[in-house]
Amino acid sequence: GEVVGVLAEDWSMSEDGMVSTFQIKQGVKFSDGSDLTAEDVAKSILAVPVNLGQYNGSYGRLSTIIEDAVATDEYTVELHLTQPYYNTLRELCLANPFGIVSSEQFNDDLTAKQESFRSATYGTGPYMYAGDNDGQTWNFVRNPNYWGEAPEVDSFSIKYIPDNDAKILAMQNGEVDFLSGIKNVSAESYAQMEQTDGYGAQVDEKSLQTYYVGYNLSSEIFGDQVVREAISSAIDKDAVVDNIYGGLFDKADTFFSRDLPYCDVEQTVYGFD
C-alpha cells in the first residue's frame, strides 16, 4: 500500500538511499502539552535499538542499520543508515517500535524512564493512558492536547482475560464489547458468535503472519533432507485449516504471507501425499 504521512508532512531520500529527510508537522503537541519537535523524533528513533537490546531486529531490519538521527532544525529530521534499505518508510510506520514520544521520557543514554512509561503515555495520539486496575484492565482517555479531530469515544479499557470461554462469557454478559485476534478467540468461539444474533464477526482479508513448524536441522533425524520432505508431504495442510482453524485461515505454501510486498511468488511446493 501507499505510505501516508501523519507526523511527517513530507520526506525525501538521497540518491544512494543512505539518508532520509523528514519534514515534521508543526503545531502537534504531546499528551503532556509539550510541542512535538524534530529533536523528539530523532531521539525516539535512536532509542529504539538501545531499548530493544538483544531483541533489536525482531521488528524489522531498519533498527539494526541506523547510524544516526539528527534534528537539522526545529522541524526537520535526517535519518542516516549504514546501508541502503528499501523498506525504510514502511518500517517507520510501525508504532511498535517506532512510535514517537516526548524526548523527556528518555535518560541521557537513551534508555526509557521506566517509571514514566508505566504510569503514563507521552505520545501524540487521540488517547492517553489513564492507569490500570490491578494489572488486569488498562484504561485510556481522550488526549486533551490531541492535534487532530477529537475521537467520538471518551474512553475505553483493555481487559486481560486468559481463558477463552471466559472471554466469550464476558462479551455475552456485556463486560466487553470487542474481541480481537485468532490467539484470543478460538475458531469454535468465532463460529458461535458469528451465528448469534446481535453480534458481528469478521476476518481480515489480508494477513502478514504465517504459522509454521520448523525443523531442527541439528537433529540426526531432521538433518536428513529425505525425512524432512517425507514429513512435509505427510502433513495435510487443508485438513489443518479446516479442522483446527475452522476454515478461517488460508493454506500457506510459502514462509512469507503473499500479502507482503514482493512475496506473491509462484514456486513448487510439497503436496499432501
Model-derived segments and their meaning:
Residues 1-15, 46, 122-123:
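N-terminal lobe/hinge region of extracytoplasmic solute-binding protein
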Residues 2, 93-151, 155:
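Gly/Pro-rich hinge or "lid" segments in bacterial periplasmic/extracellular proteins
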Residues 7-8, 34, 88-99, 124, ...:
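A structural "hinge/loop" feature
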Residues 12, 16, 23, 58-106:
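Surface-exposed binding/hinge segments that line
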Residues 28-34, 107-108, 146-149, 218-227, ...:
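Short helix-loop capping/hinge motifs at secondary-structure junctions, enriched
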Residues 33-35, 40, 165-177, 225-226:
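Short helices/loops that flank or line small-molecule/ion binding pockets
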Residues 68-70, 130-141, 157-219, 242:
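Extracellular/periplasmic solute-recognition and catalytic clefts
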Residues 251-273:
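Structural transition elements
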